[in-house]
Amino acid sequence: MNITLRAGERLFINGAVIRIDGKASIELLNEVTFLLENHVMQTEEATTLVRQIYFAVQIMLMDPAAAGSAAPVAHSLVESALSAYRTAELAAGLKGVAASLVRGRNFEALKALRGLFALEDKELQLGETPSAA
């Protein structure tokens, strides 16, 4: 897999933080856990259930030492979201996220969660479910 980074951009690989001085292309030759800086969610952005799940999974990717404590939180939040949300498409996506987490495919779960943001926003705008506390 090839990743192109801009000057000053950070890349998180297996818990390590790498900052690039100039534009660079990196080729990952084996399977690693990585996260691009532009996909990193800040704490204050985790305002809904799906975003809180994303944040918990993000912690698992960025800090492997914290994965053991973040994983049960992520699973619990998925269960809460499945109970709270009504749309079939959102529920199916959350079930896929849960399956990815069980298989240890955290990056796959994170990618799926990004795709659920718009569905969650739509459901919240309809006023059918509350946002997370």
Language model regions located:
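Helical mechanochemical/support elements of P-loop NTPase systems and associated helical scaffolds
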Residues: A46-L49, I53, A70, G93, ...
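A general alpha-helix detector
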Residues: I53-V57, S76-L77, G96-V97
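Mid-chain, well-packed structural core segment of small domains
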Residues: I59-A92
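C-terminal charged interaction modules
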Residues: E79-A133
